[in-house]
Amino acid sequence: MLKPISITAISSISALGHAPATVWETYLEKTRLFSKMEGDWVSKISAESEQAIAQLIQEKTAYKNLDRTVLLAILNARACVTSLKFQQKRIGVNVGSSRGATGLIEGYHKQFLEREKVSPFASPTTTMGNISSWVAQDAGLDGVTIDHSVTCSTAMHSLLNGIAWLQADMADAFLVGGSEA
């Protein structure tokens, strides 16, 4: 018989906000959260969330080299991990991104075109495995870390993969999600 699986924490960062109460209050306002940016309609994340990202970057020198997708994933993971007390030993992490470290890739490409050199951080900070490994490291978890990319459904695949690992008894808990920047 399959054992029951429960979602015990949830977090998001969007134009609605970051803190659960703020997200709900903004949602109930029924206002549009789109604005024009460089001629395109966008839905930017909240100023509160931008400030949280800036504070995160200040915490560790290594964080300044990370892609925005990784920083967003770390912030969301922290919100989930701090609301729980993980007693289990085998905790996996599966956070994916359909676009990955696009911001850094574009920056490194521009740098190469201008200087004909690329930063030594280009490869390690744009590798797909970067998201889950940084989330696990930040949370102090040492279980399996998995990344993948599935257009438009990466977070759902992370959830399903986490369930599969739990049902197979290869992990006691799983931190799952998707990150796009």
Label every PLM stretch briefly:
Residues A155:
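Short conserved active-site loop signatures built around small residues
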Residues D147:
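Active-site rim beta-loop-alpha module in soluble metabolic enzymes
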